[in-house]
């Protein structure tokens, strides 16, 4: 596939073609995802759980993120690389700039920040300095201790109204993409229609502009044995990891994944 840029993703949204994203942490899987046609590789702080064995993403450092971004870059030829700013890496505007620079210099094309309206100043600062930003809303794993666990967000009308307003405000602040996690399908559809930038979902129904899953989850690999409702094991019925990756891309593009059973109601 040709090199994927923000312009590519914006064009896919306008054409109504679904965007495919998977987490990726190393060169070998970056190459495999390229071969399968995955358009965005998310170097996520989820590596703290699936690679390092922690029970949350909080222990992950910016240095560790930069290491994995560089690894993915070496195996990547076509996909856009999106990198998480880990826990407290954007606690101040100065830290936001410094840590974003480390990830971009390691090979990221875009950084992702978790939160809500309070992110506006950070997003504006980065966008003005040439750093594209994806705003991660809904269930934000870095805030798991405040949220009281990994729970669906936006189910009551006040939360839903605030999330819609925040999404529009973050777009106006300069966010180039949104990621909605564990949000009622109807609310995710409304937000996707309300903003001009691409919206990627995970546990957010089928009406977002694209989908993302944790690589290990969609390959049926789990330390805990707990499988989130929004996950499908794409290794089932396949004879290789490469076939599973291609099946994921095919099903997202065809809008057969996610199904109703993978989403949440209000």
Swiss-Prot record:
The active site is at 181 (proton acceptor). Its cofactor is Mg(2+). Binds 1 Mg(2+) ion per subunit. Disulfide bonds: none annotated. Its main location: cytoplasm. This is 3-methyl-2-oxobutanoate hydroxymethyltransferase. CDD domains: KPHMT-like. It catalyses: 3-methyl-2-oxobutanoate + (6R)-5,10-methylene-5,6,7,8-tetrahydrofolate + H2O = 2-dehydropantoate + (6S)-5,6,7,8-tetrahydrofolate. InterPro entries: Pantoate_hydroxy_MeTrfase (IPR003700), Pyrv/PenolPyrv_kinase-like_dom (IPR015813), Pyrv_kinase-like_dom_sf (IPR040442). It comes from the Bacteria. Mg(2+) binds at residues 45, 84, 114. HAMAP family: PanB (MF_00156). 3-methyl-2-oxobutanoate binds at residues 45-46, 84, 112. Keywords: Cytoplasm, Magnesium, Metal-binding, Pantothenate biosynthesis, Transferase. It is found in: Cytoplasm. One of its GO terms (molecular function) is magnesium ion binding. It comes from Pseudomonas fluorescens (strain Pf0-1). Its EC number is 2.1.2.11. GO terms for cellular component: cytoplasm. Homodecamer; pentamer of dimers. GO terms for biological process: pantothenate biosynthetic process. Belongs to the PanB family. Pathway: Cofactor biosynthesis; (R)-pantothenate biosynthesis; (R)-pantoate from 3-methyl-2-oxobutanoate: step 1/2. Catalyzes the reversible reaction in which hydroxymethyl group from 5,10-methylenetetrahydrofolate is transferred onto alpha-ketoisovalerate to form ketopantoate.
